[in-house]
């Protein structure tokens, strides 16, 4: 399956925040057919996938969230010309497609690589499953570097943390708060 086909496959599986179970199940099932360095470990609606081991170099983790912002106006997932349109196509399913492509490609990178697919990033910090996954998975405590494949204008950017809790009402089209344009 090409990278674009994998992205379309992911985008056809709805996964608005709080409804990641089907996508988590389908990604787990797809990865169960791949030669992995160990068993897939599940925590709630999140999975940790040991892809490669034994290279003696750095242990790298790639992370991406399974949930997307809930939308009602995007229409079905589709390819038009050289573009793919769907809820979550850029944030975050493009990163997930890359992770699946790495797993399914027989030419693996020469490093110890772990993939982390986690739930509930798009909502309140208290519900985000990444923290509990990092706390519960003993192997993730020893990674050399972790990269969140969150889109950031195609540039490597330092992450930020923090939260603001408020109630607000807006009218208009759904947009991601980091890039509302």
Protein language model features and the residues they cover:
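N-terminal hydrophobic or amphipathic helices/low-complexity stretches enriched
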Residues: 1-13, 160-162
């Amino acid at each position: 399956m090409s990278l674009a086909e994998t992205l379309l496959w992911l985008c056809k599986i709805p996964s608005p925040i709080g409804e990641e179970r089907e996508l988590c199940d389908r990604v787990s099932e797809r990865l169960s057919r791949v030669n992995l360095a160990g068993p897939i470990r599940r925590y709630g609606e999140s999975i940790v996938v040991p892809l490669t081991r034994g290279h003696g170099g750095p242990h790298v983790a790639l992370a991406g969230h399974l949930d997307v912002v809930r939308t009602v106006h995007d229409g079905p997932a589709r390819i038009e010309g050289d573009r793919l349109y769907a809820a979550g196509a850029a944030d975050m399913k493009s990163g997930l497609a890359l992770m699946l492509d790495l797993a399914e490609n027989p030419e693996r990178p020469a490093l110890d690589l772990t993939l982390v697919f986690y739930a509930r990033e798009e909502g309140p910090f208290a519900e985000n499953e990444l923290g509990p996954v990092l706390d519960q998975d003993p192997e993730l405590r020893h990674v050399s570097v972790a990269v969140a494949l969150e889109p950031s204008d195609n540039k490597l950017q330092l992450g930020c943390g923090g939260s603001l809790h408020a109630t607000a009402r807006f009218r208009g089209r759904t947009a991601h708060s980091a890039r509302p344009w």
